[in-house]
Each structure stands twice: as C-alpha cells, then as structure tokens.
Amino acid sequence: MGVRFSWGTEVRKLDVEGDKVRGVVTNWERLAADAVVVALGSYSPLLLKRHGIKLPVYPVKGYSLTIPITDASRAPESTIMDETYKIAITRLGDRIRVGGMAEISGYTNDLGPARRRTLEHSVMDLFPGGDAKEASYWSGLRPMTPDGTPVIGPTKIAGLFLNTGHGTLGWTMSSGSARVIADLVSGRKPEIDATDLAVSRYA
C-alpha cells in the first residue's frame, strides 16, 4: 500500500472493458487498477462523456488577487465579506487575498482587466495597506453542480467512482469526501448515508 505521486502526468482516457474499469491511460503509460476515482473538478465530465456518463458539473470561474502588505495597520486582521461585490477579503501572513465572483464562460482561464479593477477597488477601498501594483492575479474554475452538492460515489461502470463537484467548498469538504469515497471503494459502509451523493440522483 501507499501513494505514488506522478507529477507532469496527464490522464488521457479511462481503460474500460465491457462494464468494468481496468485502469487509466496517461501520456506516459497505461496504469492498471481495480478501482479508479475521477476527481478532476470541472474537467471530470470531459473524461467521462465518452463512456456514456453524463455528469452535470460545470466550470464557474472565480478570480483572486494576492497583494503584499505595506502597512499592517491598514490591512485586515480576519476574513470579511464585501457584500456589495460578493468578495471575500482575508489576511495571509504578510499578504491580503481578495477573491470571489462567479462567471460562466466555459473552460477559459483568461484574466479580464475589468475583474481585476473590481477586486482592487473593493480591497483598496476598505484596506489601503497593500501595494496593488505588485499583486498577483489568478483565476480558477469551480466545479459546480445544479443542486450545489458534490457528486461522490459509484457509477454504472464497475470499479469507477466519482469525487467531484464541490463548487467553492473543495478544501472545506476534502477530508470528509475522501473518507466517504475511501469507504465506498473499500466496500465499507460510510458513516453517513451517501446514497443521495451519487451521480444516479440526476437520472
């Protein structure tokens, strides 16, 4: 047992024979497996669709700005919400992180200047103790489901499991989701009833 990390590896497709998963095919090799967990966030549906699994997980883009603090007395001490712009502002050591927004624009990670201006305006208006010119600007895709609940559980293909669709709460739900999926893969009964988390709820 144990874990082997494979950096720089791209999963190209699932290896499925009949109604059973046999492993995955990567850009380097074929990896045999008794069970496969698809945990690719917003990209999960792209891997599954060729196998007839319709997964309603959609990419919803969010933006963040990380700003170095130049005046600690004019920086936040704890996390706050700017309800006008629906943006969270928090302190990360000697930096201010401001993030939020929800944009439906497909699988794009482009960084629009208007979004940056909104983030800068929000944080600098409330906490002018940072150097916005030195900020790092980032966007990412949140894997959202229609009902806001993640998809965790088995699929119609034996040995193929899903752990995706956590939306904005990926880190928050990561440990609990990992426990549930580990139990399901191992044939144990999870501590919670996970029936309604499976993709079959959308059938």
Curated annotation (Swiss-Prot):
The alphabetized UniProt keywords are: Oxidoreductase, Plasmid
Q: Which GO terms describe its biological process?
A: D-alanine catabolic process
Catalytic activity, EC = 1.-.-.-
* Any Gene Ontology CC annotation: cytoplasm
Keyword hit for Oxidoreductase: yes
Gene Ontology molecular function terms on file: D-amino-acid dehydrogenase activity
Q: Which family does it belong to?
A: Belongs to the DadA oxidoreductase family.
Q: What does this protein do?
A: Either a functional dehydrogenase or a non-functional fragment.
Matching entries from PANTHER family are given as: D-AMINO ACID DEHYDROGENASE, SARCOSINE DEHYDROGENASE-RELATED
Protein name (database record):
Uncharacterized oxidoreductase y4sL
Q: Which organism is it from?
A: Sinorhizobium fredii (strain NBRC 101917 / NGR234)
